[in-house]
Curated annotation (Swiss-Prot):
The keyword Lipid biosynthesis applies. GO terms for biological process: phospholipid biosynthetic process. GO terms for molecular function: acyl-phosphate glycerol-3-phosphate acyltransferase activity. It is an enzyme of class 2 (transferase). PANTHER family: GLYCEROL-3-PHOSPHATE ACYLTRANSFERASE-RELATED, INNER MEMBRANE PROTEIN YGIH. InterPro entries: G3P_acylTferase_PlsY. Its EC number is 2.3.1.275. It is a multi-pass membrane protein. Pathway: Lipid metabolism; phospholipid metabolism. Keywords: Cell inner membrane, Cell membrane, Lipid biosynthesis, Lipid metabolism, Membrane, Phospholipid biosynthesis, Phospholipid metabolism, Transferase, Transmembrane, Transmembrane helix. This is Glycerol-3-phosphate acyltransferase. It is found in: Cell inner membrane.
Length: 197
């Protein structure tokens, strides 16, 4: 198969993998309310934690992370360069945020992005995690931890990989994460965002 055609097939596969909603599947497995209609109405690990507890949330987090990692690992196996892999990450992320299987209404994409980062540049992924944990311990607000980690991720990525073209794609994803967190940002500005218990 021609490399260009193979890349298009991989992008399509990545979008479909991203479109699998771990939160919805986990909620059905544990007989929990639909995460799209309960809590924050977001099919993500944080909302599953609210409505279903730590076990269900952990499975959701791992599942969403694997969704991000698997397409990256496939791209590595097929020997695509880093720029192409970052486009794979973007498409997988878009699958999570706009899943074809669930009326294009998905999660916010942080866990899927993190899983992809760990597979692409584990030092960048670890830097994201360390930042998130530090901010969460100090400020005790999950969304703010995610947003601060997201802001710093392109800096970490460029310093670690020295790949400017790929960094631009990472910046695009990070901007999109801010877009998916609009409601959180409004609550943060109004001092109404929930804190981590």
């Amino acid at each position: 198969m021609l490399p260009e055609l193979l890349f298009i097939v991989l992008l399509l596969l990545s979008y479909l993998i991203g479109s699998i909603s771990t939160a919805i599947i986990v909620c059905k497995m544990f007989n929990l309310p639909d995460s799209r209609t309960q809590g924050s109405n977001n099919p993500g690990a944080t909302n599953v934690l609210r409505i279903g507890g730590k076990k269900a949330a952990a499975i959701t987090l791992i599942g969403d992370g694997l969704k991000g990692a698997i397409p990256v690992l496939i791209a590595h196996y097929l020997a695509f360069n880093m720029l192409n892999v970052t486009w794979v990450i973007l498409v997988t992320f878009l699958g999570h945020v706009y899943p074809i299987f669930f009326s294009f209404k998905g999660g916010k994409g942080v866990a899927t992005f993190l899983g992809a980062l760990l597979a692409l540049s584990y030092l960048t992924g670890l830097s994201f995690i360390i930042t998130w944990v530090f901010v969460a311990k100090v400020l005790k607000i999950s969304s703010l931890s995610a947003l601060i980690s997201t802001v710093l991720t392109p800096v970490y990525f460029y310093l670690i990989t020295n790949n400017l073209a790929s960094t631009y794609v990472i910046i695009l994803i990070c901007l999109w994460i801010f877009y998916t967190h609009q409601s959180n940002i409004k609550r943060l500005l109004n001092s109404q965002e929930n804190k981590i218990n």
